[in-house]
């Protein structure tokens, strides 16, 4: 599993960019941190024009390379699997 400080970084960046939901997916869910080559995330409801800035900051701040999948738009079978099998690590709440 990804270390807590790395999760905290990703969540902080998600909040900064107004992300709706952030999921941890892939090998970081079940492998030991030293066995993970990169972090895989999926994101939903990123405000228009912020996706690449959000992704760029993740790439700069995280200790490993990052892959990011955009779940916005029509839900497909692939996206449904990601949501079902991934771990929701952040969800924006209505204030």
Language-model regions: role of each:
Residues 1-23, 29-35, 44-95:
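Catalytic core of pol beta-like nucleotidyltransferases
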Residues 40-42:
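Short, well-ordered beta-strand segments
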């Amino acid at each position: 599993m990804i270390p807590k400080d790395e999760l905290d970084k990703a969540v902080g960046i998600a909040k900064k960019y107004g992300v709706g939901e952030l999921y941890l997916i892939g090998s970081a869910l079940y492998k030991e941190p030293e066995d993970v080559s990169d972090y895989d995330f999926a994101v939903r409801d990123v405000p228009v024009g912020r996706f690449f800035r959000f992704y760029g900051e993740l790439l700069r701040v995280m200790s490993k390379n990052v892959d990011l999948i955009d779940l916005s738009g029509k839900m497909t079978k692939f996206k449904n699997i990601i949501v079902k099998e991934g771990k929701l690590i952040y969800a924006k709440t209505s204030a």
